[in-house]
Structures are given as C-alpha cells and as structure tokens.
C-alpha cells in the first residue's frame, strides 16, 4: 500500500468528487501510544480515515476535531487534525471490550461532535447522534444535516492499516442523484484488501474503468502531536501553586505526560518557580 496518502479525484462526466485515503504509519503512531483493545484499534483507524477525508473538504486553513462521546465503556474517541493533513488521536475506555462490539455497545447513548476552527473567522460545530450501525453512516448523517449534499463514505481498518473512500455531489443547479447513486454502487464493491495493497490509480481503474476520472496530485498524511514544554508549563500554571509545590516536595519533580504521543516533560523546583514568576520553565528536559 502507498503509505499515508490522500488522493482527490473528479468525475468529468458527473458533478461528483471523490477522495481516497490510505494510512499506515500515522495509524500505527495513533494506536501505538496505548494498549488499545482490538475493537478500539479498528474504531480509531476508521475515525482517523474519516477525519482525513473530512479535512480534505475544508475550504480554509485551520483545525478540525472529530470527537465521539458517550455513556458506555468508551467515554471518548477523538482525532484532531489540520488542513495540512497532520493528525493525532486518543481514546478512553474502561473494562474489557468485545471484539465484535457495535458502536452502541461501545458508546451507549453516544454522539459525534465535529468542530471546525479556522485560523481566521468563527468556529463551527456540528453534532449528530451515534445512532447508526457504522461510523461511516454517522459521518454521512453529519453531511446530510450540515451541507445537505448527498455524501457517502466507506471506512476500513484492521489494526495494521486504515483506509477510506468518500463521494460527494458537487453543488449544482442540476440533479445528479442518478450519477451519484451509480458511482456509489461501483464504489461499494471495494474490498479492504484492495485499499490496503493497491495504489490509487489501480483502485480507481478497478472501480471506475468505464468512467472519466481526473486524479489530482497526492497529499501526504502524517501524525503530528502539538504538545510542547511550553504548553505543559502553561497547564501547570493553571493549578494552584501550593498544590504543585506539595507534589514537588513529595516527588522532587513535577512530571507532565502527553496522552497523544507519550512524551513526558519534567519540571524541577527552579522550573516551577520560573513558571509562577514568568510563565515558563527553564529546563529543556523531556
């Protein structure tokens, strides 16, 4: 498989656009930070692919967050990213999770929150219930509510690789639902193994060899964590100084860990004094 690449394409004979994402390294970095149960590894892979596909639809520079929450054994699964296709994610759960657990089994009464944060302009947030059998269907529901353009997704993950495909009707005065349904029928024949092993040109040829397809230059997808020593210091400063000094007195240091990438930032007494005096820590230990 071509690793960590998103491809966009257009149908010249229909007002429909498509996306194809294939992920391996970035997926492994997301799920490698914690000992996730297999079903959660698969869910995070699908969520990572979905977020990458959603990110490619952004018409601005900025950030995106796709968050699943609920009152079930999985309380949170989230992928954060930006328009440069830099992604990171985590999940939180309790107890054992069955390999065949459904979305309802995992999240109970759950919902999906998609937050778009432009570098300039107002933030947008959309919320849909996790009341469909698959994550792909829930994302389709989001598009139906927010953009009201016919949209379809196919998401796959197996703990090693993740992939997804996306079709959407372009805004137009004409009715292209028949074209869209035809292309969806073709796309629905895709198999996970094909997405995990073939490059984009081969996949598109197999699916759409009788269609006129224009494939654009590939876009690299990567794992990127935004944690830093400065952010950790800022987080410490929000805590009461006496509480932090009590930790320092007991442990001789204050340690901050990143849930996304497992980086650790260690602050000694001099650092803590500097944080509350100036807002930064002097040391560079990580």
UniProtKB/Swiss-Prot annotation:
Gene Ontology cellular component annotations, sorted alphabetically: cytoplasm
Disulfide bonds: 225-227, 258-261
Subcellular location: Cytoplasm
Recorded family membership: Belongs to the HSP33 family.
Keywords per UniProt: Chaperone, Cytoplasm, Disulfide bond, Redox-active center, Zinc
SUPFAM superfamilies referenced in this protein's UniProt entry, alphabetically: Hsp33 domain, HSP33 redox switch-like
Post-translational modification note: Under oxidizing conditions two disulfide bonds are formed involving the reactive cysteines. Under reducing conditions zinc is bound to the reactive cysteines and the protein is inactive.
Main location: cytoplasm
Lineage start: Bacteria, Pseudomonadati, Pseudomonadota, Gammaproteobacteria, Alteromonadales
Species name: Shewanella sp. (strain ANA-3)
Chain's role: Redox regulated molecular chaperone. Protects both thermally unfolding and oxidatively damaged proteins from irreversible aggregation. Plays an important role in the bacterial defense system toward oxidative stress.
Record protein name field: 33 kDa chaperonin
GO biological process, one term: protein refolding
HAMAP family: HslO
Pfam family, one: HSP33
GO molecular function, one term: unfolded protein binding
